[in-house]
């Protein structure tokens, strides 16, 4: 999905992220065409940074398109700023990678804490029904709290949702054609998708893990690859 965003974006697009797995995927997969086009909180870990930063980029960007790539957890820290985006005429385009969990925290709990999941399930998308929890409305429809499409529409923005690759491509194309108001696309992402490579907390960067159980081969004497 991030690769599709990059492929369909204009060369002068300003890219903004929140904090989480989506931030890492964006850094890995976006093909930046120009310098000074990347705004992210980096190692500060400031969840909620994305939307306010994207609004600022849109207001001060001299008409350059702005794509915010955010996660459902990070986005909800400052989602009320959709009102500011609407009233400030900041037509930001929001790609919401909705895996219904705090994905980065869940990844750590999977890899280092024996899959003991604590306080990571948001129940706003694909993860409802997990751990014995099942919420229903009208007898058969899973409850999503919040429904991000309705949330966007409540703030005067355009809301869309994509479950498949074809739907994602179509939504991105449509979003790129809308320039008079903010747009939010709720992309459904598998909750157990992980970011690779990674370095565990407290470990040296030399101790990088490429994939589960796969680390670089090194010479014991020189430390060379």
Residue ranges of predicted features:
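Alpha-helix C-terminal capping segments
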Residues: 8, 29, 54-63, 83-91
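A short, small-residue-rich loop immediately preceding and capping a beta-strand
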Residues: 63-77, 92-97
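Glycine/aspartate-rich loop-and-adjacent alpha/beta segment that forms the canonical ThDP
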Residues: 150, 165-225
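A short alpha/beta connector and helix-capping loop motif
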Residues: 80-99, 196-198
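Conserved thiamine diphosphate
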Residues: 110-171
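A short, conserved beta-to-alpha structural element at the edge of catalytic cores
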Residues: 89-116
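Short gly/pro/ser/thr-enriched loop/turn and capping motifs at secondary-structure boundaries
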Residues: 23-24, 45-47, 75-76, 100-104, ...
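Active-site diphosphate/adenylate-binding microenvironment
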Residues: 1-57
């Amino acid at each position: 999905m991030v690769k599709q965003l990059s492929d369909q974006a204009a060369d002068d697009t300003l890219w903004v992220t929140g904090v989480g797995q989506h931030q890492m995927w964006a850094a890995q997969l976006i093909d930046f065409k120009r310098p000074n086009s990347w705004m992210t909180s980096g190692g500060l870990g400031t969840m909620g940074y994305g939307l306010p930063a994207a609004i600022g980029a849109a207001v001060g960007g001299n008409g350059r398109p702005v794509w915010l790539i955010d996660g459902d957890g990070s986005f909800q820290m400052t989602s009320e700023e959709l009102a500011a985006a609407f009233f400030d005429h900041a037509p930001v385009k929001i790609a919401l990678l909705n895996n219904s969990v705090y994905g980065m925290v869940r990844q750590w709990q999977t890899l280092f804490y024996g899959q003991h999941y604590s306080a990571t399930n948001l129940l706003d998308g694909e993860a409802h029904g997990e751990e014995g929890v099942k919420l229903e409305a009208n007898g058969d429809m899973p409850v999503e709290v919040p429904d991000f499409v309705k949330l966007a529409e409540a703030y005067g923005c355009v809301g869309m949702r994509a479950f498949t690759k074809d739907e994602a491509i179509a939504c991105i194309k449509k979003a790129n054609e809308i320039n008079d108001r903010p747009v939010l696309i709720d992309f459904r992402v598998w909750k157990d998708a992980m970011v690779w490579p990674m370095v565990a907390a407290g470990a040296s960067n030399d101790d990088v893990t490429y994939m589960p159980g796969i680390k670089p081969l090194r010479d014991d004497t020189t430390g060379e690859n």
